[in-house]
Amino acid sequence: MAAPEPLRPRLCRLVRGEQGYGFHLHGEKGRRGQFIRRVEPGSPAEAAALRAGDRLVEVNGVNVEGETHHQVVQRIKAVEGETRLLVVDKETDEELRRRQLTCTEDMAQRGLPPAHDPWEPKPDWARAGSLSSDAGQKDVNGPPRELRPRLCHLRKGPQGYGFNLHSDKSRPGQYIRSVDPGSPAAHSGLCAQDRLIEVNGQNVEGLRHAEVVARIKAKEDEARLLLVDPETDEYFKRLRVTPTEEHVEGPLPSPITNGTSPAQDASAWKRDPFQESGLHLSPTAAEAKEKARATRVNKRAPQMDWNRKREIFSNF
């Protein structure tokens, strides 16, 4: 009995035929990403070993896992007459997710690393283990990784900086949606899912998407971005501390032990609901009740200005 074929991504090179590539791409409700729905018999897609149910990871070397259906289609059409697709079947996809591995073209050639390989690559947002109680995260075969913000210096190339910035309606802030391989953004250490904290030394957490874009474009050919990956973001939020450039190499905030940390107290003071009016006081029970009532009355969000829809995504 033949041994089962090892799990690995597949790199499919398609040359367009008279009837196109011969496959159907679609998104699935409840699942992230784009999937191959159907492959036409005798088509270039079938000849390239594309299969129904495959999940699309890269198009022509660019990761598209976080992109919309329309954006993925445009990337496929960008190179006329041919395309290169990195895909994974369901079993390979599940194994990559279980081991928290980032799918790459190299894996299509060499296969997945051994399950117990201490050098197994992991994305910045998925280091082994869970958040520890301090500012580092234990790795089974190495020292703890300190959860620090990253300061990325970018110089604009002929095609721009090479990253896509977007806002997520489910959470505040601006996030790196995708980074083009080989771009200035990639070389400077930007990663997909990073949250943007500062632009050129100025905090932008409370700004609208268009305002953040304007800050990035303020300097014509360069930008200095302070970012946090999801783990670091969660750590600083737990401590209620705003990341700054000082945290890149300087002392990190102390973890919470046996109660509230000083950082928590300071942050709680800063978030006093009366601070904006100049009164640094805690509300009385009656004031809190009135504030809650007013919030319920005015909780309906203002109608969206559809002329500003383009603020949601920006390419650099």
Swiss-Prot record:
Stretches the record annotates as Disordered: 109-148, 244-303
SUPFAM superfamilies xref list: PDZ domain-like
Keyword Kinase: no
Subcellular location field: Endomembrane system; Nucleus; Apical cell membrane
GO biological process: protein localization to plasma membrane
Membrane topology qualifier: Peripheral membrane protein
Keyword rRNA processing in annotation: no
Domain of life according to the entry: Eukaryota
Chief location of this protein within or outside the cell: membrane
Tissue occurrence: Detected in kidney glomeruli.
Molecular function GO terms recorded: protein-membrane adaptor activity; type 2 metabotropic glutamate receptor binding; type 3 metabotropic glutamate receptor binding
Pfam families reported for this sequence: EBP50_C, PDZ
Domain PDZ as annotated: residue spans: 11-91, 151-231
Record PTM Phosphoserine, positions in chain: 130, 183, 254, 282
Keywords: Cell membrane, Membrane, Nucleus, Phosphoprotein, Repeat
GO cellular component: apical plasma membrane; endomembrane system; nucleus
Compositional bias per record (Polar residues), positions renumbered to this chain: 255-264
Assembly: Homodimer, and heterodimer with NHERF1. Binds ADRB2, SLC9A3, P2RY1, P2YR2, SRY, RDX, PDZK1 and LPAR2. Found in a complex with EZR, PODXL and NHERF2. Interacts (via the PDZ domains) with PODXL (via the C-terminal PDZ-binding motif DTHL); interaction is detected in glomerular epithelium cells. Binds PODXL. Interacts with SGK1 and KCNJ1/ROMK1. Interacts (via the PDZ domains) with SLC26A6.
Function comment: Scaffold protein that connects plasma membrane proteins with members of the ezrin/moesin/radixin family and thereby helps to link them to the actin cytoskeleton and to regulate their surface expression. Necessary for cAMP-mediated phosphorylation and inhibition of SLC9A3. May also act as scaffold protein in the nucleus.
Record-given protein name: Na(+)/H(+) exchange regulatory cofactor NHE-RF2
Species: Oryctolagus cuniculus
